């Protein structure tokens, strides 16, 4: 009897001990999770709540330290979104929760709606930190030299947006009801998509309809181009439907007859007829040839537009060749100029001067270039593959340019110096007598040693090796 009682007591105590351990374990497990406070909707201006991932935290279905939180986008995925070159991968923050541990989690969604969830945002519900940071989805761009007299290139295809697509959450198309092919627009803002770099103009219709919005503007308006300019969805001439009476088909083909592209040029001149020569109106002839050159297939250059005898309703066969683009390899000619320095400073230049001796290279990644004709340089560095470059055009683009080195050097006495450069046209001529498009053009520079730190930011990789 006693033995049976003892055994029952032991079993009872064991059961109680197990239950106690289970209770402690459950309590400890519960304490390992945070609890989230009430959800709050963010009410500040929506554009100020555009953010981008930093790649340091994952995205969850609920605050990440709360029980039941599941991963929506891993830390690795968020890192990819952080380094993305697509505006669609920005986020919009629209809500917030704070845990009992003081951690703030923002409710966010990507601009394309693909990812939505909570991401750790630091310890403040008024500033973005942790897994996200504020983002400027667009960057202000220079206004075009011409702001009036634009038309939609094709009213059936081109449209306006409330914001450049994916730069604001739920950016949408603008209704074009009331817009005709001859509706004029005025440009009142210009911006680029920060990640893609693509240019957009904000335009407003001048017909009193109040219609306005953003539209892709291609390379933007050019002050040097002749004839009609097509800027993405905008044109400097009204939209006209192509017919035999007002258009010329252009076929681009190589010297062996291989077709590599085609296009259609349409005149905005009234009264033209099928079979009549385009050259009957000098302005139209100029516009046609400019169009042929401007709309050539990618990777080709026009060697002969063959447009002299073009007639409306017929085809022009423009001859093209493979194009090649050179870059300029900058080199120092002679010893650096030090005349602007005091005698004491000139004697202290040795440590800095060692890096820029006669014949040394100047990388495009270490120089800031400025000049009124640099925009033309890419065009002048592109030509028919195998042909000798036209150095006179390149000289013209570079001779008024100034170059500032971005590197700061220190002398033996600890003084700061940097270099500025000017283009040496005469030395360049002797170095490029037989340089062909696609090969580096040697650009010789005269270097000047300047006292003080460099504050310039490199921009030279577009044109210079």
From Swiss-Prot:
<keyword id="KW-0964">Secreted</keyword>
<keyword id="KW-0134">Cell wall</keyword>
<protein>
    <recommendedName>
        <fullName>S-layer protein</fullName>
    </recommendedName>
</protein>
<keyword id="KW-0325">Glycoprotein</keyword>
<comment type="function">
    <text>S-layer protein. The S-layer is a paracrystalline mono-layered assembly of proteins which coats the surface of bacteria.</text>
</comment>
<dbReference type="GO" id="GO:0030115">
    <property type="term" value="C:S-layer"/>
</dbReference>
<feature type="signal peptide">
    <location>
        <begin position="1"/>
        <end position="30"/>
    </location>
</feature>
<keyword id="KW-0732">Signal</keyword>
<dbReference type="GO" id="GO:0005576">
    <property type="term" value="C:extracellular region"/>
</dbReference>
<keyword id="KW-0701">S-layer</keyword>
């Amino acid at each position: 009897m006693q033995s049976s009682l003892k055994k029952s007591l032991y079993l009872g105590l064991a059961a109680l001990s197990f239950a106690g351990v289970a209770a402690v374990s459950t309590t400890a497990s519960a304490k390992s999770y945070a609890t989230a406070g009430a959800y709050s909707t963010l009410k500040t201006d929506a554009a100020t709540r555009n953010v981008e991932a930093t790649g340091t935290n994952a995205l969850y279905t609920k605050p990440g330290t709360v029980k039941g939180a599941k991963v929506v986008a891993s830390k690795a995925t968020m890192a990819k979104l952080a380094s993305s070159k697509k505006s669609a991968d920005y986020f919009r923050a629209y809500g917030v929760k704070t845990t009992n541990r003081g951690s703030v989690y923002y409710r966010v969604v990507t601009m394309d709606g693909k990812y939505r969830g909570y991401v750790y945002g630091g310890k403040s519900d008024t500033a973005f930190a942790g897994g996200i940071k504020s983002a400027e989805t667009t960057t202000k761009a220079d206004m075009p030299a011409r702001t009036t007299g634009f038309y939609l290139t094709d009213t059936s295809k081109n449209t306006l947006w409330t914001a450049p697509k994916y730069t604001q959450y739920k950016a949408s198309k603008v209704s074009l009801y009331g817009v005709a092919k001859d509706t004029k627009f005025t440009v009142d803002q210009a911006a680029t998509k920060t990640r893609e770099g693509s240019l957009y103009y904000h335009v407003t219709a001048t017909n009193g309809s109040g219609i306005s919005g953003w539209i892709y503007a291609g390379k933007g308006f050019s002050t040097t181009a002749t004839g009609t300019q097509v800027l993405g969805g905008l044109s400097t001439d009204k939209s006209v439907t192509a017919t035999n009476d007002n258009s010329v088909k252009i076929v681009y083909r190589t010297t062996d007859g291989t077709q590599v592209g085609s296009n259609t040029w349409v005149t905005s001149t009234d009264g033209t007829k099928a079979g009549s020569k385009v050259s009957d109106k000098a302005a139209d002839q100029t516009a046609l040839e400019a169009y042929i050159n401007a709309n050539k297939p990618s990777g080709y250059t026009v060697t002969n537009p063959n447009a002299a005898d073009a007639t409306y309703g017929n085809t022009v066969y423009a001859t093209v060749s493979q194009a090649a683009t050179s870059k300029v390899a900058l080199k120092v000619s002679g010893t650096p100029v030090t005349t602007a320095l005091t005698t004491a400073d000139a004697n202290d230049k040795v440590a800095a001067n060692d890096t820029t001796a006669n014949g040394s290279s100047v990388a495009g990644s270490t120089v800031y270039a400025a000049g009124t004709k640099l925009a033309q340089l890419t065009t002048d560095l592109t030509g028919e593959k195998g042909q000798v470059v036209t150095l006179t055009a390149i000289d013209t683009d570079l001779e008024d340019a100034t170059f500032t080195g971005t590197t700061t050097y220190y002398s033996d006495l600890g003084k700061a110096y940097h270099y500025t450069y000017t283009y040496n046209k005469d030395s360049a001529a002797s170095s490029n007598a037989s340089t062909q498009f696609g090969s580096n053009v040697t650009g010789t520079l005269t270097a000047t040693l300047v006292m003080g730190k460099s504050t310039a930011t490199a921009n030279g990789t577009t044109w210079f090796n």
